[in-house]
Amino acid sequence: MKIAVLPGDGIGPEIVTEAVKVLNALDEKFELEQAPVGGAGYEARGHPLPDATLKLAKEADAILFGAVGDWKYDSLERALRPEQAILGLRKHLELFANFRPAICYPQLVDASPLKPELVAGLDILIVRELNGDIYFGQPRGVRAAPDGPFAGEREGFDTMRYSEPEVRRIAHVAFQAAQKRAKKLLSVDKSNVLETSQFWRDIMIDVSKEYADVELSHMYVDNAAMQLAKAPKQFDVIVTGNMFGDILSDEASMLTGSIGMLPSASLDKNNKGLYEPSHGSAPDIAGKGIANPLATILSAAMLLRYSLNRAEQADRIERAVKTVLEQGYRTGDIATPGCKQVGTAAMGDAVVAAL
């Protein structure tokens, strides 16, 4: 089994190193091949997603991704900025389903900004569609307004759109995920205002006829954002579009105490996927050895489970992470009084020892 390892920028190389360390500690050995991406790709090959990196990603059975982005690239034209690498990978590999778990570990309840009784036992899965919506809809741009009260003035515009096949395929993925959990699925939209959202809701209802064992409900995105902060444990699996999912998954991540704990998976129709931590590249702490590698290590566990069908090995890694937390090890972002505060490499070593 071949894994493409794309560390990226900022803290990416540090946290990916620890995930690779954990993978190498397993009984089964994998072929790991590394390539530059993001700002590192631009520096090495003049593009955030070099041809050789894309070729490796296509040939691999799965991709372990760090993070991309750095302020020093903000002056580049948009097509050359590091963030275009992840968008390009999603497009070329046809990764359309993003899984973002939000789990509050018992040992980290006090790290959450919410009261312990609100988050104890929290276990949410957000399924986000990745390829459509306003992020990719055309036309888009800046122009002179053709009409309206400010006709002739400059305006920016984007297009929110979804095709029926796009909505149906993410619906099936979400319903199947719900079948494996509590058999509850919440679809989040803004159908009281947006035609695209009403279209989304209608298709969700239609697809639900194929999943009689799953209870489908609906919620407007503004209410969902409020309810995530007010009573998050009412949710199990949430399915939503690209933009709403982007926002809600970041909100849900903070309920757990630290975004540094949360993995994610982006899958194609055959479960080949790209696995990355939910957090960004954090260039302000890059090279300091203090970043939390657990989200990346847990992303490696998701990689084993979903793309390589190695559920037992994935379980081992997840149990090891829980053991490390029970032993009191903490990086700075999840540190609490009386804990054993450690750096990036020491946390990786602790997980390997727990294996």
Curated annotation (Swiss-Prot):
Pfam families: Iso_dh
Bound cofactor: record note: Binds 1 Mg(2+) or Mn(2+) ion per subunit.
Chain residues that bind Mg(2+): D222, D246, D250
Protein family according to the UniProt entry: Belongs to the isocitrate and isopropylmalate dehydrogenases family. LeuB type 1 subfamily.
Example of a GO cellular component annotation carried by this entry: cytosol
Catalysed reactions listed for this entry: (2R,3S)-3-isopropylmalate + NAD(+) = 4-methyl-2-oxopentanoate + CO2 + NADH
Species name: Burkholderia multivorans (strain ATCC 17616 / 249)
The protein's name: 3-isopropylmalate dehydrogenase
EC number, as in UniProt: 1.1.1.85
Annotated binding of NAD(+), by residue: G280, S281, A282, P283, D284, I285, A286, G287, K288, G289, I290, A291, N292
Enzyme type, top EC level: oxidoreductase
The protein's required cofactors: Mg(2+); Mn(2+)
Site (Important for catalysis): Y135, K190
NCBIfam families named in the record: leuB (TIGR00169)
The protein's annotated pathway: Amino-acid biosynthesis; L-leucine biosynthesis; L-leucine from 3-methyl-2-oxobutanoate: step 3/4
Underlying gene: leuB
